[in-house]
């Protein structure tokens, strides 16, 4: 059994006086402008990738050791970091597979990887260039050595791809 709340006539008339000037709401839904937000994020990501591509020049070739495994260490970074990369002390949190890509596509993907690592605070990444015709294997170390956010890199240990991959140590600007 439910009780009905009955209001006396005075309460009803007071309520009607209180809402006398009120109008019905035409629309009470909220429209989110998510397409604009997504579009801005995509534009920002494209711009960051293009800016990162600026660091990769095909004309400039830094002096890298041609003997033994490919390795590089920026002047302000301890060589102990390269040793830790070689031994596999750093575990890559992000992997990039460049098999089957052209040089331009690989350059763009490499720039995007470095930006993604910086945004997500990832310190070590693995770039797999494969064996193939050795074009990417020769170009990737030259591009990485030019980027200011790359602290060091070394040929990956067997666990992470051996001579078909490179472990990259990326600087985190906090």
From Swiss-Prot:
Keywords: Endonuclease, Hydrolase, Nuclease, RNA-binding, rRNA-binding
Enzyme category, top tier: hydrolase
HAMAP family: SmrB
Binding partners and assembly: Associates with collided ribosomes, but not with correctly translating polysomes.
Task performed by this protein: Acts as a ribosome collision sensor. Detects stalled/collided disomes (pairs of ribosomes where the leading ribosome is stalled and a second ribosome has collided with it) and endonucleolytically cleaves mRNA at the 5' boundary of the stalled ribosome. Stalled/collided disomes form a new interface (primarily via the 30S subunits) that binds SmrB. Cleaved mRNA becomes available for tmRNA ligation, leading to ribosomal subunit dissociation and rescue of stalled ribosomes.
PANTHER family for the chain: DNA ENDONUCLEASE SMRA-RELATED, UPF0115 PROTEIN YFCN
Protein name per UniProt: Ribosome rescue factor SmrB
Organism listed in the record: Tolumonas auensis (strain DSM 9187 / NBRC 110442 / TA 4)
Gene it is expressed from: smrB
